[in-house]
Amino acid sequence: MLRREARLRREYLYRKAREEAQRSVQEKKERVKRALEENQLIPTELRREALALQGSLEFDDAGGEGVTSHVDDEYRWAGVEDPKVMITTSRDPSSRLKMFAKELKLVFPGAQRMNRGRHEVGALVRACKANGVTDLLVVHEHRGTPVGLIVSHLPFGPTAYFTLCNVVMRHDIPDLGTMSEAKPHLITHGFSSRLGKRVSDILRYLFPVPKDDSHRVITFANQDDYISFRHHVYKKTDHRNVELTEVGPRFELKLYMIRLGTLEQEATADVEWRWHPYTNTARKRVFLSAE
């Protein structure tokens, strides 16, 4: 079993490395092609290999855009089989973190919650893989306030790290009633860049395909790289109007890293993307949208 997992992991990493090299060459070709079409100077860093890139452009066509990649392979069963989500917390969780984990369990249809206890991360991931879990969610806290969420897709990754802020739990709102556990419709807004689509896939594939008559709606709305999570149910008051009711919880997500591996491979997995907040242009740039 361990040899098989190691072999599959090596094949996945080799395929990913080849795709990354091919994507880098393709981006260079597109830059040279754009410069020639617009009658502009070829970028300085591409001038040595510009002739070779131009010669290979003759054999390129639009047919390669639909070729599957390691990203497609990670979520190849999305929409075919329902995801199996496991939710746990950091060690020694407070009562409020336990309540937040319980609320997250109700957000994702069919999810299960596991008490962390003294289990190590490696043991958690191995147990999840053995039981067919597709995604492992770990919630972290600071003095009783949830501040971090890790979403690790199994068996090979990726793993996304989010900061949580402005968390409002259902337990904080009196007389809220019960929560619908139907499969929800999803709304994703503002994820127009390549990284944004990647993050959108990581989040939306945590949910199964809904039925047409479901009255439950979950929204992930991106604005200035802060992802607002909202949870509503709706009912039709007449043939034209719809009444929305927020049922909670609500919070904001801020992505700060994506690793190409599972949670226990934190020391060895490659970093696909990392937020650098201390650069001069960090406050001006947005990454999840193309604006």
UniProtKB/Swiss-Prot annotation:
Pfam families given in the database record: Brix (PF04427)
Keyword Ribonucleoprotein: yes
GO molecular function term, any single one: snoRNA binding
Cellular component GO terms held in the UniProt record: Mpp10 complex; nucleolus; preribosome; small-subunit processome
Brix domain sequence ranges: 83-264
Compartment(s): Nucleus, Nucleolus
Gene Ontology biological-process annotations: ribosomal small subunit biogenesis; rRNA processing
Keyword entries, A-Z: Nucleus, Ribonucleoprotein, Ribosome biogenesis, rRNA processing
Gene3D superfamilies in UniProt: Probable brix-domain ribosomal biogenesis protein
Primary localisation category: nucleus
Role this protein plays: Component of the 60-80S U3 small nucleolar ribonucleoprotein (U3 snoRNP). Required for the early cleavages during pre-18S ribosomal RNA processing. Part of the small subunit (SSU) processome, first precursor of the small eukaryotic ribosomal subunit. During the assembly of the SSU processome in the nucleolus, many ribosome biogenesis factors, an RNA chaperone and ribosomal proteins associate with the nascent pre-rRNA and work in concert to generate RNA folding, modifications, rearrangements and cleavage as well as targeted degradation of pre-ribosomal RNA by the RNA exosome.
UniProt subunit comment: Part of the small subunit (SSU) processome, composed of more than 70 proteins and the RNA chaperone small nucleolar RNA (snoRNA) U3. Component of a heterotrimeric complex containing IMP3, IMP4 and MPHOSPH10. Interacts with MPHOSPH10.
PANTHER family associated with the record: U3 SMALL NUCLEOLAR RIBONUCLEOPROTEIN PROTEIN IMP4 (PTHR22734:SF2)
Record's protein name: U3 small nucleolar ribonucleoprotein protein IMP4
Organism from which the protein derives: Rattus norvegicus
